[in-house]
C-alpha cells in the first residue's frame, strides 16, 4: 500500500469511551509497524435544548439540557497489510461511531 493514508474519525457522547477506543487503534497500528499521527481532538459540538417544565403557565420555569458530541481524528500513514488486517479485527465500544476513509 504505497503512498496510502487511512483517516479514522471517531464520534461519541462519552469522551472516555472515545479516548479508550483511540488508544486501542493507535496501539494496534504501532504494533503492526505503521506510523500514526494523532489522536487529534476536534471541536466538541454542543447542542442545547430548553424545555418548559409547566404544561400551562409559568413561562419562567424551564429546564435546559446539553448534548455534547466529542470527536477525534487519527491518521495512519503508510499502513501495511498487517495494519489493515488488525484494524478490521479490532472490536471497539458500542457507543463510538467510527468512520474510515482511504486517501
From Swiss-Prot:
Signal peptide limits: none
Q: Tell me the domain of life.
A: Bacteria
Q: SUPFAM superfamilies annotated for this entry? A: Ribosomal protein S10
Q: What GO biological process term is on the record, naming one?
A: translation
> Pfam families attached here?
Ribosomal_S10
- State the GO CC annotations: ribonucleoprotein complex; ribosome
Keywords for the protein's UniProt record, in alphabetical order: Ribonucleoprotein, Ribosomal protein
Single GO MF annotation: structural constituent of ribosome
Q: Which PANTHER family match?
A: 30S RIBOSOMAL PROTEIN S10 FAMILY MEMBER (PTHR11700)
What is the purpose of this protein?
A: Involved in the binding of tRNA to the ribosomes.
Task: Describe the protein's quaternary organization and the partners it interacts with.
Answer: Part of the 30S ribosomal subunit.
Protein name per UniProt: Small ribosomal subunit protein uS10
Amino acid at each position: 500500500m504505497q503512498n496510502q493514508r487511512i483517516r479514522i474519525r471517531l464520534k461519541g457522547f462519552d469522551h472516555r469511551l472515545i479516548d479508550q477506543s483511540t488508544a486501542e487503534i493507535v496501539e494496534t497500528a504501532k504494533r503492526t509497524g505503521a506510523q500514526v499521527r494523532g489522536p487529534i481532538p476536534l471541536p466538541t459540538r454542543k447542542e442545547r435544548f430548553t424545555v418548559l417544565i409547566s404544561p400551562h403557565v409559568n413561562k419562567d420555569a424551564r429546564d435546559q439540557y446539553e448534548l455534547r458530541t466529542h470527536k477525534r481524528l487519527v491518521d495512519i500513514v503508510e499502513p501495511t497489510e498487517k495494519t489493515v488486517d488488525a484494524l478490521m479485527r479490532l472490536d471497539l465500544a458500542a457507543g463510538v461511531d467510527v468512520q474510515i476513509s482511504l486517501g
